[in-house]
Amino acid sequence: MDVIDSNEIFRKFDYSSVITQADIDYAIQDIKGIIDSGNYWENSPKFQTKENIFARQHPTWMKFRMSFLFSVFQYFGQEVKVGKMQAWSFMTNKEGAEDRETLWHHHQHVLEPRMMSGIFYLHIPEDVENRDLCGTEFAPNGPENDGKFHVKPSDFHWLVYPSKYWHRPAAPQSSKYRFILAADVEIH
């Protein structure tokens, strides 16, 4: 399986000067609280939060929300008109691993407005077997076809890409939890 760092379609934006480890620690504790309260989907990767986590009114979530939005602007090289924006989190490990084939998804069926997606890796366990293969897997030609690849996860970065591309979380490689923040925004 091929692995890339980024390219002209799957782009990364560095927020290490804005988002701190304390922000990440706060977000992880908040996500654990959401999961512990039972507010997660049962038909998604275990555990995926139900609520729009960007709607939380806390300075930490504002940093994540605004950094994602600014990443989208950077992606286009200009400010663009946006619509609905939402985010959720995955808290996954080997014990909660699901059938990999059911996890593929995209927004290609939505022609207008266009959608952009983003992924922020909050925490990847230190004991993963291969860090390059623990982020997100993409299938630009569809899940049944050749050309699949992984994008290497980078700490303190947003990975931004058009939502029309098939994607899924990489298989968990640790019994410890991996925390991922995922977001979508409409572009008008």
Spans of model-derived segments:
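Non-heme Fe(II)/2-oxoglutarate
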Residues: 1-81, 101
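Short, Φ-rich (hydrophobic/aromatic) sequence segments
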Residues: 23, 27-35, 119-121, 181-187
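Catalytic core of non-heme Fe(II) oxygenases with the double-stranded beta-helix
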Residues: 78-171, 176-180, 186-187
